[in-house]
Amino acid sequence: MGIEEKIPGGFLLTTVEKAVGWVRKSSLWPATFGLACCAIEMMATGAGRYDLARFGMEVFRASPRQADLMIVAGRVSQKMAPVLRQIYDQMPEPKWVLAMGVCASSGGMFNNYAIVQGVDHVVPVDMYLPGCPPRPEMLMHAILELHEKIKSTKLGVHAVREAHEREEAAKHALPTHSMKGLLR
């Protein structure tokens, strides 16, 4: 016998953080940053067959100032990295980043000086999506997993501290090509 049974109908008991998390997850506005073949699959996800609109993502934003989710789809060159960081910095808080595909996550098969070995060395990444390229169903699953992460996001000072810690950890992370013995 809890308080829920004593309250008349039409009332909902929750915390402010949970209510804000529910609202934020229900209205993500993605910014496109399609650089390679993963961008084709990302565009297919927005088409009628998969219909991202049912998850509150009606339109991909061309302006970073109107977006709160950056989907980095494809490989990032060393010359493109500062542009990626500039677009990330222009996005309003709260913001999330999804690395789509092996190239965005770890540099993929392009282990050379011209390709960034993981976009997490440029911006903090909230969700990694493997695949070469990942199917639209996989992107939708990653977005739904990101929704769950967004629902549990902290507010206020705790959120700022958490974001700064994530960004500092990403800046000081060991490059993927320096890690030895990963496949053994």
UniProtKB/Swiss-Prot annotation:
It is a peripheral membrane protein. Its main location: membrane. It is an enzyme of class 7 (translocase). Its cofactor is [4Fe-4S] cluster. Keywords: 4Fe-4S, Cell membrane, Iron, Iron-sulfur, Membrane, Metal-binding, NAD, Quinone, Translocase, Transport. Gene3D superfamilies: 3.40.50.12280. PROSITE patterns: COMPLEX1_20K (PS01150). GO terms for molecular function: 4 iron, 4 sulfur cluster binding; iron ion binding; NADH dehydrogenase (ubiquinone) activity; NADH:ubiquinone reductase (non-electrogenic) activity; quinone binding. Belongs to the complex I 20 kDa subunit family. NDH-1 is composed of 14 different subunits. Subunits NuoB, C, D, E, F, and G constitute the peripheral sector of the complex. This is NADH-quinone oxidoreductase subunit B. It comes from Acidothermus cellulolyticus (strain ATCC 43068 / DSM 8971 / 11B).
